[in-house]
């Protein structure tokens, strides 16, 4: 995995973990190499408690490590944090597998149920049983519920599942069909073309 790809993946995971504040903490930690939570808070302007939460989440995700140093004068321990990308490919794979399972569950739900909707964006999509309970009227606006065409959602889910399975090596990429070569008819000895 190249340096830029690694950095982008790390920042994406940081954003998932703690939003823009986590991205700032990771950037500061990468730039500094090793720092305490207080130093990171000062560098980023993020509250110390938030920095600690982010660091612990990165540690739980196996993307940060620390070393503990005891101050002989005060007896206090200081934690020096650093980013650890050795396990980044493993973390990315695990996250993709989790996403794949979630997408498969969503596909199962979309294909096993018939849904009903009033057509108003933001209003709930209801299963047959739920729609029946409401007398096939939207619980928000009271409009009639119609069968919901989820074929586009199903196709998008199948496409993303296939992409993830290919990325994870669980499925071979589809083979591209080669264009067929035009065949020439052979001429017979008499000069006429054979069929």
UniProtKB/Swiss-Prot annotation:
Task: Domain (HTH TFE/IIEalpha-type): give its ranges.
Answer: 6-89
How does the record comment on the protein's domains? Answer: The winged helix domain is involved in binding to DNA in the preinitiation complex.
Please list the GO biological process terms of this entry: regulation of DNA-templated transcription; transcription initiation at RNA polymerase II promoter
Q: Which region ranges are annotated with the description Disordered?
A: 172-195
Provide the taxonomic classification. Answer: Archaea, Methanobacteriati, Methanobacteriota, Thermococci, Thermococcales
Alphabetically sorted, this entry's keywords are: DNA-binding, Transcription, Transcription regulation
* Protein name, UniProt field: Transcription factor E
Protein role: Transcription factor that plays a role in the activation of archaeal genes transcribed by RNA polymerase. Facilitates transcription initiation by enhancing TATA-box recognition by TATA-box-binding protein (Tbp), and transcription factor B (Tfb) and RNA polymerase recruitment. Not absolutely required for transcription in vitro, but particularly important in cases where Tbp or Tfb function is not optimal. It dynamically alters the nucleic acid-binding properties of RNA polymerases by stabilizing the initiation complex and destabilizing elongation complexes.
Assembly, per entry: Monomer. Interaction with RNA polymerase subunits RpoF and RpoE is necessary for Tfe stimulatory transcription activity. Able to interact with RNA polymerase in the absence of Tbp or DNA promoter. Interacts both with the preinitiation and elongation complexes.
Q: Name one Pfam family in it.
A: TFIIE_alpha
Q: Name one GO molecular function term.
A: DNA binding
The record's annotation in InterPro entries points to: TF_E_archaea (IPR016481), TFE (IPR039997), TFIIE/TFIIEa_HTH (IPR017919), TFIIE_asu (IPR002853), TFIIEa/SarR/Rpc3_HTH_dom (IPR024550), WH-like_DNA-bd_sf (IPR036388), WH_DNA-bd_sf (IPR036390)
Q: Where is the composition biased (Basic residues)?
A: 181-195
Q: Does the keyword Transcription regulation apply?
A: yes
Q: Which organism is it from?
A: Pyrococcus furiosus (strain ATCC 43587 / DSM 3638 / JCM 8422 / Vc1)
> What family name appears in the similarity comment?
Belongs to the TFE family.
Report the leader peptide range. none
């Amino acid at each position: 995995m190249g340096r830029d790809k690694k950095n982008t993946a790390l920042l994406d995971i940081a954003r998932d973990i703690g939003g823009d504040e986590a991205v700032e903490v990771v950037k500061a930690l990468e730039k500094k190499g090793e720092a305490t939570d207080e130093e990171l808070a000062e560098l980023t302007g993020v509250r110390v408690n938030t920095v600690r939460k982010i660091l612990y989440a990165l540690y739980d995700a196996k993307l940060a490590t620390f070393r503990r140093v005891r101050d002989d004068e005060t007896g206090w321990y200081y934690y020096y944090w650093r980013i650890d990308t050795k396990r980044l490919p493993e973390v990315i794979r695990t996250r993709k597998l989790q996403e794949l399972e979630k997408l498969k569950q969503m596909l199962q739900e979309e294909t096993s149920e018939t849904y009903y909707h009033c057509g108003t964006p933001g209003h709930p999509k209801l299963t047959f049983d739920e729609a029946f309970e409401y007398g096939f009227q939207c619980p928000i606006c009271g409009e009639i519920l119609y069968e919901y065409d989820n074929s586009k959602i199903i196709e998008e889910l199948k496409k993303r599942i296939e992409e993830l399975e290919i990325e994870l090596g669980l499925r071979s990429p589809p083979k591209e069909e080669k264009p067929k070569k035009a065949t020439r008819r052979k001429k017979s000895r008499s000069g006429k073309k054979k069929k």
